[in-house]
């Protein structure tokens, strides 16, 4: 295939399945030897391929462009040329284009050092797995994968192929990361028994009422619908699944929890060493549907005691008016101008609260999302504690620079798959509780749901479509 400026297309004569042989051979060498960057072994720019270049994927492209540390060697999007991809294509008109990531690797794999994955949640897994199996570093938007099993395989691949793999919850390189770490190490945050996390902004499915999947519509000429479906089960095309609308559907997305949980309780999960819960409960679901996410959800994740830390209950609240009880002295929500706007809801969404309350021994904290720093509440207690707080270091790098430096062996990924994986698996368990409107026990030692066979079966997700099974064996 010739990846000239007119897009390399899925209709090319090059066989797309030849990637397996290359994946296995590249993976074997990556396992035993440190891999030099293809672009410049002396330490120059990193050759970057970007999968998903519209909407959030396009924002990721621009974040990497700002670093000045990358060469874009390939763009891949199943809807290449659609309006939401034109911004990136206009800025970088000479970068080779593909609709199919498998053809991209077949054609340009030797030139690629690292890959971004900014596609819908359900399609993260095959792209990331193929990239890692070929020794490519991976920056993957959150959540890592859609099912518990997918996430486990992605963590295993990170270890097996010895690559830098970062999940794109960018606040994990912000002020809250370094503050939470310093506060826990100094004993300021200690013996936490409860966290209330809330995301009460409008979501795309709010107000939706469906009694099945959407009716078939003509596929736009720019879109490769079978490749967009990726590992998902067969569905007829409908524009109601596109451009972020997929987030509404269990078959494609992970709801408000999967979209925002990694921005709200990520640091608590890491530094309180939460791991995986022993019990998950759908406490309240408003407007439950077997197809789309509830209009409002209250979920409880109950974590066992951990090495001197007490049992902890993480309560999750989403929905426009589904707020947690707030402690005295809470005041207003934490507002951080660096937090990106929500993808739906317009200006009103900016006014809706998002954040957390952390109940520790002797102190209570409130925080927002992404990198927003915690505040001790009430304010009188904050003033009393001010002189006793440890110094919090500045971040040496933002999230994408941290990843790029990790590709070069200069830093470690702050949200590596090893760190982000159990967080994403916890959220995937919450989605199972939502989908079945149930409560279940989970055994972290075996990775199985012990008292609900239907829920346990969902740990693996739905079987992949024919022709997509191989990504589970890489």
Where in this protein do the model-derived segments appear?
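N-terminal secretory signal peptides and thylakoid transit peptides that target proteins
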Residues: 5-27
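N-terminal Rossmann-like dinucleotide-binding module
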Residues: 22-92, 171-174, 268
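Beta-loop-alpha module in the N-terminal Rossmann-like domain of NAD(P)-dependent dehydrogenases
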Residues: 54, 79, 95-153
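Short, solvent-exposed loop/turn and secondary-structure capping segments
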Residues: 59-64, 84-88, 125-130, 150-151, ...
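Conserved acidic residues
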Residues: 73, 113, 193
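Short, solvent-exposed turn/loop segments enriched in Gly/Ser/Thr/Pro and often Arg
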Residues: 79-82, 98, 118-123, 144-146, ...
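A contiguous active-site-proximal alpha/beta segment in oxidoreductase catalytic domains
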Residues: 137-139, 145-227
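Contiguous beta-strand/loop segments that form the cofactor/metal-binding neighborhood of enzyme cores
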Residues: 179, 191, 196-202, 206-418, ...
């Amino acid at each position: 295939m010739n990846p000239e400026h007119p897009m390399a297309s899925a209709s090319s004569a090059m066989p797309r399945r030849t990637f397996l042989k290359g994946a296995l051979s590249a993976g074997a060498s990556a396992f035993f030897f440190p891999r030099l960057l293809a672009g410049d072994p002396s330490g120059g720019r990193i050759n970057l391929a970007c999968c998903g270049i519209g909407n959030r994927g396009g924002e990721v492209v621009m974040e990497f462009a700002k670093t000045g540390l990358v060469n874009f060697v390939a763009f891949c999007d199943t809807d290449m040329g659609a309006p939401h991809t034109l911004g990136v294509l206009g800025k970088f008109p000479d970068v080779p284009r593909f609709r199919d990531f498998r053809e991209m690797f077949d054609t340009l794999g030797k030139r690629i050092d690292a890959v971004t994955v900014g596609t819908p949640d359900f399609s993260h897994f095959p792209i990331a797995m193929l990239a890692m199996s070929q020794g490519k570093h991976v920056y993957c938007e959150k959540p890592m994968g859609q099912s518990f099993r997918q996430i486990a395989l992605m963590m295993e691949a990170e270890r097996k192929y010895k690559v830098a793999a970062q999940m794109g919850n960018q606040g994990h390189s912000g002020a809250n990361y370094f503050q939470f770490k310093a506060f826990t190490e100094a004993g300021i945050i200690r013996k936490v028994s409860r966290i209330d996390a809330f995301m009460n902004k409008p979501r795309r499915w709010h107000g939706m009422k469906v009694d099945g999947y959407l009716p078939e519509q003509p596929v736009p000429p720019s879109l490769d619908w079978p490749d967009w479906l990726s590992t998902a089960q067969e569905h007829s095309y409908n524009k109601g699944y596109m451009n972020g609308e997929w987030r509404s559907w269990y078959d494609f997305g992970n709801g408000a929890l999967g979209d925002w949980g990694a921005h709200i309780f990520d640091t608590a999960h890491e530094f309180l060493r939460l791991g995986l819960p022993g019990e998950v409960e759908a406490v309240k679901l408003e407007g439950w549907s077997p197809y789309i996410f509830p209009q409002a959800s209250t979920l409880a994740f109950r974590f066992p005691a951990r090495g001197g830390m007490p049992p902890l209950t993480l309560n999750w609240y989403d929905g426009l008016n589904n707020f947690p009880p707030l402690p005295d002295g809470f005041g207003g929500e934490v507002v951080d101008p660096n937090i990106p706007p929500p993808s739906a809801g317009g200006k009103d969404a900016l006014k809706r609260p998002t954040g957390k309350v952390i109940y520790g021994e002797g102190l209570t904290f409130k925080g927002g999302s992404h990198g927003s720093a915690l505040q001790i509440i009430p304010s009188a207690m904050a003033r009393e504690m001010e002189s006793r707080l440890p110094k919090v270091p500045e971040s040496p790098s933002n999230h994408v620079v941290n990843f790029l430096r990790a590709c070069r062996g200069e830093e470690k990924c702050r949200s590596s798959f090893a760190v982000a994986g159990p967080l994403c698996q916890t959220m995937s368990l919450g989605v199972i509780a939502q989908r079945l409107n149930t409560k279940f026990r989970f055994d972290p030692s075996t990775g199985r749901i012990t008292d609900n066979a239907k829920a346990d079966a969902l740990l693996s997700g739905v079987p992949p479509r024919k022709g997509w099974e191989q990504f589970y064996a890489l």
